[in-house]
């Protein structure tokens, strides 16, 4: 049924609430899991007379990317030990657009994610990223509500 499942993660425990569910799906359907992280850091834009330490900026970005890769590799290694095929996919830019683009590029049959909403209106119930994905996604979407995860 599901051969490729895209799993957006932001490193938070709330986002990780989806992990047991996709692990179960991967084992049941022998699906390939793609762990997605979208880097939202804006590009470096300077005013005409502004001075910035470019090397420090690039080093900070490199360290953040390395931290993200280490985080995702840890999850991938745990799953590989269980016989689950998993890879990472890194995007940069707005989160919703990154999820949509990655789902298309990876030909995901399913996007599985945890909502981060806190209650209130529709956007607050789901979270703004989840609401954006719901509006734009062109394939099945599995949502797990993670409001009780700290």
Model-based region annotation:
Residues 110-135, 150:
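Glycine-rich, Arg-bearing micro-motifs that act as flexible, cationic patches
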Residues 1-54, 87, 149:
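Small/aliphatic-rich secondary-structure junction motif
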Residues 54-70:
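A short acidic, glycine-rich active-site loop
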Residues 74-111, 148-150:
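Structural beta-alpha unit
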